[in-house]
Amino acid sequence: MSKRIYNFNPGPAALPLSVLEEIQATFLDFAGTGMSITEVSHRSKPFDAIINDAVTRVKRLLGIGDDFKVLFVQGGASMQFAMVPMNLLPDGKSADYVNTGTWSTKAIKETKILGKTVNVAASSEDRNFAYIPKELSLDPNAAYVHITSNNTIKGTQWADFPDTKGVPIVSDMSSDILSRPLDMSKFGLIYAGAQKNIGPAGVCMVIVKNDLLEKANTGLPSMLAYKTYADSNSLYNTPPCFTIYAIDLVLKWLEETIGGLEKMDAVNREKAALLYDLFDASSFYNGTADADSRSLMNVTFRLPSEDLEKRFVEEATKNDLGGLKGHRSVGGCRASIYNAMSMEGIQALVDFMKEFERTNG
Amino acid sequence: MSKRIYNFNPGPAALPLSVLEEIQATFLDFAGTGMSITEVSHRSKPFDAIINDAVTRVKRLLGIGDDFKVLFVQGGASMQFAMVPMNLLPDGKSADYVNTGTWSTKAIKETKILGKTVNVAASSEDRNFAYIPKELSLDPNAAYVHITSNNTIKGTQWADFPDTKGVPIVSDMSSDILSRPLDMSKFGLIYAGAQKNIGPAGVCMVIVKNDLLEKANTGLPSMLAYKTYADSNSLYNTPPCFTIYAIDLVLKWLEETIGGLEKMDAVNREKAALLYDLFDASSFYNGTADADSRSLMNVTFRLPSEDLEKRFVEEATKNDLGGLKGHRSVGGCRASIYNAMSMEGIQALVDFMKEFERTNG
Ligand SMILES: Cc1ncc(COP(=O)(O)O)c(C=O)c1O
Ligand SMILES: Cc1ncc(COP(=O)(O)O)c(C=O)c1O
Ligand SMILES: [Mg+2]
Ligand SMILES: [Mg+2]
Ligand SMILES: [Mg+2]
Ligand SMILES: [Mg+2]
């Protein structure tokens, strides 16, 4: 038997055990090919079946049709900070960015490096990004409105998306992709590094509306143009086959074991509530995000002192509860509870937290 | 028992069985962490140990010191076609490119997309790239000389590298990286998509000399600047952890099981000779590359008719010899025999080829 911990890492993060077991079982001989999935050609029928299945599952989960393309792009979400404006922000136009934390700040920085014009439509920097801004000063002529739907480090999440009066929303959903249903009619493009909710690190999923693709900027290097990926089903060059295979298995788990995004959302709400209720009932644990901006994915909290926080993380680790340290830029504690974190994991954490408060409070 | 075939795919390609077995055995619990390697944080001690080990092994294998950086970059070799000139070709300078096939042609195309100046120093296009050019018209002021060391599709390889009078060579070594010793003093940068000689698809290894890094172009998006990777040990953002782990195991195999690049080279020469000797002794099988330009990695050949080639590939497949079809752009047959292809695999192929000639010749 392998030892398994409850893994609260922010990403790379826990994956469903059944997915890991299937990868392991088939690792030397994938689908009767006599090859590992790491050895199969990306120009083969077995791999075509995988990538097509993944695309179909994403579309079905999100309820989108042929007006969107689902792309697999390397370079992580960080590469998208540059690719989004390269492709979607034409010269002479500007884009609105809402600054809700570290990742939004980086998205803005990369856009400016390209010499493009950014309008910061709102920011919550005044209170260390502890909330999602309510008032946005949007430019009706903006090429797009960029939003970080879930702020992994600050522990905040957009509960609803704003009405942008027809300007397409571009959203970094790295830390909450496929964790809840979405009204996709509001979005022009969403992107997400795989390594939190949908698979191992090594690919970024980009879902883009055809009309944006059609008017995208031209003259880009092939690997930096969305069109290259859209025209080739992400097979212009060798894709990260193993990672896409693992993602396909996670998507299958999401559809067939969980039962889709409504069900996933309900479970995620229940999981997060167990922790937030504990904070609200205790003076020992305190959440860092405003109540109306709390993330269902990254639950950030503080203990009465940094010493206690250090001991908390250490003792949790000894109890096989891993990854609870807050991001180095903010300190404190953080429990990342993405789709694959089970209710049992949350329950184990809650039990540990109560015991730790009893003995240290 | 898993079924295993002899896999002659051009990439993704065969990996050493012992590497696959180790990944499989540790897949649910990596190094006692209680997590899969796909779930381990890239900011953790266990992952640091992996990436540092990989870098150290590459340097030891190639006999290079701290004057080079070993980087892991996403996007495959195709992304390097653009990143090389973005970083290393300053405005007002030009670069020399030797055109030896499909991949060189693409490298040239991407450089031109960027509006940069290319001098084609030589080309073997006149005879469908069946040879490596001997005469190069090099520009002493070029920023670099770009060479595709092994032409995966055309089956040709540079046996030696030219004297470029101090101008650094930049080489796409996707299909022969770490297959033989190199005199690294000639090179400013080498790059290789992992999926042929060193691991699964999903990362490109870039080995670059510090002096080129120091004078590299600035003002690039973070993910497109080599400096970003060099300054962060390839951990600026989330790297493809699983792929880097697999590469580290392949490097360990290369050092500890094979015994380094001299040994690997000797084995590779022996393997290729078995096939080329067969061609030379037979009028049924004929190599497509000039004798002095033959690749030790991708052995391209023709049979007397396309019908026979089709039957050859089909019957080979039935005999568990996979991936022998030539690239769709050239036809014919191709046996890709990278580092991980065993002598037993070559012997099985040679036996099959003799039998096929006997019954169809
Ligand atoms: C919201 C968000 N955006 C972007 C990133 C950067 O992702 P990557 O490491 O894939 O570039 C992260 C990583 O944690 C994130 O949480
Ligand atoms: C020599 C060479 N260069 C570049 C490439 C493209 O590599 P990638 O698919 O990693 O972009 C290949 C792929 O076969 C290749 O053989
Ligand atoms: Mg954040
Ligand atoms: Mg409280
Ligand atoms: Mg070629
Ligand atoms: Mg012959």
Curated annotation (Swiss-Prot), chains A, B:
Belongs to the class-V pyridoxal-phosphate-dependent aminotransferase family. SerC subfamily. Its main location: cytoplasm. It comes from Desulfosudis oleivorans (strain DSM 6200 / JCM 39069 / Hxd3). Its cofactor is pyridoxal 5'-phosphate. Pfam families: Aminotran_5. Pyridoxal 5'-phosphate binds at residues 77-78, 103, 152, 172, 195, 237-238. It is an enzyme of class 2 (transferase). Homodimer. InterPro entries: Aminotrans_V_dom (IPR000192), Pser_aminoTfrase (IPR022278), PyrdxlP-dep_Trfase (IPR015424), PyrdxlP-dep_Trfase_major (IPR015421), PyrdxlP-dep_Trfase_small (IPR015422). It is found in: Cytoplasm. NCBIfam families: PRK05355.1 (NF003764), serC_1 (TIGR01364). Disulfide bonds: none annotated. One of its GO terms (cellular component) is cytoplasm. It comes from the Bacteria. Binds 1 pyridoxal phosphate per subunit. It catalyses: O-phospho-L-serine + 2-oxoglutarate = 3-phosphooxypyruvate + L-glutamate; 4-(phosphooxy)-L-threonine + 2-oxoglutarate = (R)-3-hydroxy-2-oxo-4-phosphooxybutanoate + L-glutamate. Catalyzes the reversible conversion of 3-phosphohydroxypyruvate to phosphoserine and of 3-hydroxy-2-oxo-4-phosphonooxybutanoate to phosphohydroxythreonine. The lineage of its organism: Bacteria, Pseudomonadati, Thermodesulfobacteriota, Desulfobacteria, Desulfobacterales. Its EC number is 2.6.1.52. Keywords: Amino-acid biosynthesis, Aminotransferase, Cytoplasm, Pyridoxal phosphate, Pyridoxine biosynthesis, Serine biosynthesis, Transferase. Pathway: Amino-acid biosynthesis; L-serine biosynthesis; L-serine from 3-phospho-D-glycerate: step 2/3; Cofactor biosynthesis; pyridoxine 5'-phosphate biosynthesis; pyridoxine 5'-phosphate from D-erythrose 4-phosphate: step 3/5. L-glutamate binds at residue 43. The modification N6-(pyridoxal phosphate)lysine is found at residue 196. GO terms for molecular function: O-phospho-L-serine:2-oxoglutarate aminotransferase activity; pyridoxal phosphate binding. One of its GO terms (biological process) is pyridoxine biosynthetic process. This is Phosphoserine aminotransferase.
